[in-house]
């Protein structure tokens, strides 16, 4: 059942965007080498949009939502397992994408029916969240969410209370996460290659390369990916540093698909104070415009007026720039800035040593071969010219560790040494064509993320068998639940846990139900189905391994999405305005022949 009402929504132009639109083109040409300070614009646009309400009185709303879930899950599901297929995605510009990565496929899906589209978006959250936290397991999250929703809708349609059902799902999922941690084991160095290979679609070349990269920079070292110039993959290590600070504003992003800032051969301005006045930066910024080099500003903070100036000039295309807050706090922040200065050969602007921002010139800037910023992290790769200074700095910090008394202080100092001397391993992904390169890079990225997740929380048996084994723990968990309807929620989880293994088997051309029964017939927790070879064997010995963190995130996020879905009873969507007919040309004389 659907009904309509009007709702008013307002949208304000961002000050930076408004300021940009107020610059005449001629002025832009006259001031090509000048930094433009933004002008304020307080115009507000208000628009009204009618909404359509879909109530669930006859079950139609939930059915449509579930259709959207199934369409997305069926599409993403074809990529699951070692014998999963690829999905071809149309690209408006350039060649089509051929991908085997669940979250990339999920992001591209927009369904025509608005209610079905909401269902698809809802389950897409499970993939996106798993990707953000674990970097892999996105397809499994979607398939598991589909299973929980399918089983849940059946019992809710039969009259069960959705509130108690979802409470049972939540309690069971939490208990299963605790059981999962008991099944987990710490990953050995020899197993890292297997973890990466499984995630890369059974590609052992990629697995071995990632294991080699981690052996060179350490388990907690930084590994980045680049597009190679040849058809072969390659690995090299350069000195570099990574810390937990991302760009201040998303307007600095240079790659809108990955939401990252990437600069090569760029300069760094290091400021140990808050930047309050944009005019203090003009000398440095006009140097950057004239010389054409990208610049990254690392400061204690940047106030809104100064930030608006940077954003406006970046969006106008006159300046390649990004800004971020310095890592750490207080004295530790100053030490981090000094570390960055030594790595890049720059000078930290500090008033107490007689350096002021308004008098600074390009002599104080550091140099970096590459800088990559995400919303949460920054990676700085040096140009190799400061290795001697870096070694001296590391020796100084080691002396401080020996003198430090508190464990926390020693830990933080050791962290600084790792950032300075650990270096960055760079994997260059090679391929014959651009289409193959994009697909291959996504696989390697998944493999790298899976390996990092395995280092963090350990590993479990792969191939969907760990989730299937968890189902056998549900009966014991049911005894702790308060009432029968919560126990029904636990049964929903139990049935849904077999969905990923069944789909892996189906994609390998085998009956999923037969496979799951055969796996459960053995009491050996490592026994399972190897879809790559078609054999039943000890999966841990065969190298079929999943990171515990990935399996945990799949379970948590799929159950979270399923709870939200099953509690829904009404859907609100915008009514699409009909496209207006094109206005005819009043001077059209076509009816009178050619003139």
UniProtKB/Swiss-Prot annotation:
Domain of life of the organism encoding this protein: Eukaryota
Gene3D superfamilies in alphabetical order: GroEL (3.50.7.10), GroEL-like equatorial domain (1.10.560.10), TCP-1-like chaperonin intermediate domain (3.30.260.10)
Transit peptide as recorded in UniProt: 1-49
Localization: Plastid, Chloroplast
Entries under Pfam families matching the protein: Cpn60_TCP1
Cellular compartments per GO CC: chloroplast
Main location: plastid
Keywords, ordered alphabetically: ATP-binding, Chaperone, Chloroplast, Nucleotide-binding, Plastid, Transit peptide
Gene Ontology molecular function terms on file: ATP binding; ATP-dependent protein folding chaperone
One GO biological process term: protein refolding
CDD domains xrefs: GroEL
Keyword flag Chaperone: yes
Function: This protein binds RuBisCO small and large subunits and is implicated in the assembly of the enzyme oligomer.
Oligomer and partners: Oligomer of probably six alpha and six beta subunits.
PANTHER family: 60 KDA HEAT SHOCK PROTEIN, MITOCHONDRIAL (PTHR45633)
Miscellaneous field: This protein shows ATPase activity.
Family per similarity comment: Belongs to the chaperonin (HSP60) family.
NCBIfam families for the chain: GroEL, PRK00013.1, PRK12849.1, PRK12850.1, PRK12851.1
Annotated protein name in UniProt: RuBisCO large subunit-binding protein subunit beta, chloroplastic
Species this protein is from: Pisum sativum (Garden pea)
């Amino acid at each position: 059942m659907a009904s309509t009402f009007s709702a008013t929504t307002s949208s304000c132009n961002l000050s930076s965007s408004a300021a940009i639109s107020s610059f005449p083109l001629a002025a832009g040409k006259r001031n090509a080498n000048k930094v433009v300070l933004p002008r304020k614009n307080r115009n507000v646009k208000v628009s009204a949009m009618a909404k359509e309400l879909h109530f669930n009185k006859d079950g139609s709303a939930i059915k449509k939502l579930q259709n959207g879930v199934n369409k997305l899950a069926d599409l993403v599901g074809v990529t699951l397992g070692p014998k999963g297929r690829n999905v071809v995605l149309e690209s408006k510009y350039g060649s089509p994408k051929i991908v085997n990565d669940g979250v990339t496929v999920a992001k591209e899906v927009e369904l025509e029916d608005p209610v079905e589209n909401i269902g698809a978006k809802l389950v897409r959250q499970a993939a996106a969240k798993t990707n953000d936290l674990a970097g892999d397991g996105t397809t499994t999250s979607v398939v598991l969410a589909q299973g929980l929703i399918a089983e849940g809708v059946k019992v809710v349609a039969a009259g069960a209370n959705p509130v108690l059902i979802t409470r049972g799902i939540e309690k069971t999922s939490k208990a299963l996460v605790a059981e999962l941690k008991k099944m987990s084991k710490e990953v050995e160095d020899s197993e890292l290659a297997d973890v990466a290979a499984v995630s890369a679609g059974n590609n052992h070349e990629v697995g071995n390369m990632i294991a080699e990269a981690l052996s060179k920079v350490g388990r907690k070292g930084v590994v980045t990916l680049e597009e190679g110039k040849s058809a072969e993959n390659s690995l090299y290590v350069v000195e570099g540093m990574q810390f937990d600070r991302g760009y201040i504003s998303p307007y600095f992003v240079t790659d809108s698909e990955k939401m990252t800032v990437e600069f090569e051969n760029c300069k760094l301005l290091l400021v140990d104070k808050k930047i309050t006045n944009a005019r203090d930066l003009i000398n440095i910024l006009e140097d950057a415009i004239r010389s054409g080099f990208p610049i990254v500003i690392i400061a204690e903070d940047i106030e809104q007026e100064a930030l608006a100036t940077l954003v406006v000039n970046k969006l106008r295309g006159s300046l390649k720039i990004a800004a971020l807050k310095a890592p750490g706090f207080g004295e530790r922040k100053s030490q981090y800035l000094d570390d960055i200065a030594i790595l890049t050969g720059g000078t930290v602007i500090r008033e107490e040593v007689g350096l002021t921002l308004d008098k600074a010139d390009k002599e104080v800037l550091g140099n970096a071969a590459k800088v990559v910023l995400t919303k949460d992290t920054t990676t700085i790769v040096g140009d190799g010219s400061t290795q001697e200074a870096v070694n001296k700095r590391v020796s100084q910090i080691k002396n401080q560790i020996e003198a430090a008394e508190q464990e926390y202080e020693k830990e933080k100092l050791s962290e600084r040494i790792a950032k300075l001397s650990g270096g960055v391993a760079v994997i260059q992904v090679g391929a014959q064509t651009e289409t193959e390169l994009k697909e291959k890079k996504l696989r390697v990225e998944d493999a790298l993320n899976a390996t990092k997740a395995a280092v963090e929380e350990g590993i479990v048996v792969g191939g969907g068998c760990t989730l299937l084994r968890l189902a056998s723990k549900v009966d014991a968990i049911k005894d702790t639940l308060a009432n029968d309807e919560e126990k029904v929620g636990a049964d929903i989880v139990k049935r849904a846990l077999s969905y990923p293994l069944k789909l892996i088997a189906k994609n390998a051309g085998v009956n999923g139900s037969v496979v799951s029964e055969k796996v459960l017939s053995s009491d050996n927790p490592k026994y399972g189905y190897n879809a790559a070879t078609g054999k039943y064997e000890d999966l841990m010995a065969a190298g079929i391994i999943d990171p515990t963190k990935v399996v945990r995130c799949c379970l948590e996020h799929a159950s979270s999405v399923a709870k939200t879905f099953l509690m829904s009873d009404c859907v609100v969507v915008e009514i699409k305005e009909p496209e207006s007919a094109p206005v005819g040309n009043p001077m059209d004389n076509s009816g009178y022949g050619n003139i």
